[in-house]
């Protein structure tokens, strides 16, 4: 089990930095929450990280489920959520998405901004036991968007 987890982290560490939108999200979450996303959030609960199923486990997991819905909507609009790179500024604890990019880039930034601040609002209920949560335990109906 530990070896599989380590392999998963190595794969994720190799994928995240080379993809545009994911690179933005990773940086934004780190700036807003102060946590290293690849260790704290991408393998968290039933919805944080790649894919998602079942009932979210806590408020942090709900942030990720809502973010999944935001990305799903952008995909239906033809946006390349994992490749589009957007510009934003982080200043005095706030995020300002640039209005110079395409519609998809602006909306992608808005989705990522929302999840970053949602995660920050729920830092006090973050549960270490939900990091690296075993996804087969994610049961129940997946909430709709």
From Swiss-Prot:
Its EC number is 3.1.1.4. Secretory calcium-dependent phospholipase A2 that primarily targets extracellular lipids, exerting anti-inflammatory and immunosuppressive functions. Hydrolyzes the ester bond of the fatty acyl group attached at sn-2 position of phospholipids (phospholipase A2 activity) with preference for phosphatidylethanolamines and phosphatidylglycerols over phosphatidylcholines. This is Group IID secretory phospholipase A2. Ca(2+) binds at residues 47, 49, 51, 68. InterPro entries: PLipase_A2 (IPR001211), PLipase_A2_Asp_AS (IPR033112), PLipase_A2_dom (IPR016090), PLipase_A2_dom_sf (IPR036444), PLipase_A2_His_AS (IPR033113). It catalyses: a 1,2-diacyl-sn-glycero-3-phosphoethanolamine + H2O = a 1-acyl-sn-glycero-3-phosphoethanolamine + a fatty acid + H(+); 1-hexadecanoyl-2-(9Z-octadecenoyl)-sn-glycero-3-phosphoethanolamine + H2O = 1-hexadecanoyl-sn-glycero-3-phosphoethanolamine + (9Z)-octadecenoate + H(+); 1-hexadecanoyl-2-(9Z,12Z-octadecadienoyl)-sn-glycero-3-phosphoethanolamine + H2O = 1-hexadecanoyl-sn-glycero-3-phosphoethanolamine + (9Z,12Z)-octadecadienoate + H(+); 1,2-dihexadecanoyl-sn-glycero-3-phospho-(1'-sn-glycerol) + H2O = 1-hexadecanoyl-sn-glycero-3-phospho-(1'-sn-glycerol) + hexadecanoate + H(+). The gene is PLA2G2D. It is an enzyme of class 3 (hydrolase). Disulfide bonds join 46-138, 48-64, 63-118, 69-145, 70-111, 79-104, 97-109. One of its GO terms (cellular component) is extracellular region. It comes from the Eukaryota.
């Amino acid at each position: 089990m530990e070896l599989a987890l380590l392999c998963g982290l190595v794969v994720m560490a190799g994928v995240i930095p080379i993809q545009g939108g994911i690179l933005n999200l990773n940086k934004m979450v780190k700036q807003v929450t102060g946590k290293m996303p690849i260790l704290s959030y991408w393998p968290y609960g039933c919805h944080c990280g790649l894919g998602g199923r079942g009932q979210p486990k806590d408020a942090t997991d709900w942030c990720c489920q809502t973010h999944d819905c935001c990305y799903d909507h952008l995909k239906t609009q033809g946006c390349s959520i994992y490749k589009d790179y957007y510009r934003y500024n982080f200043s005095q604890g706030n995020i300002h998405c640039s209005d110079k990019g395409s519609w998809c880039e602006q909306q992608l930034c808005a989705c990522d901004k929302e999840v970053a601040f949602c995660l920050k609002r729920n830092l006090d209920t973050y549960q270490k036991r939900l990091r690296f949560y075993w996804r087969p335990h994610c049961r129940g109906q997946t909430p709709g968007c």
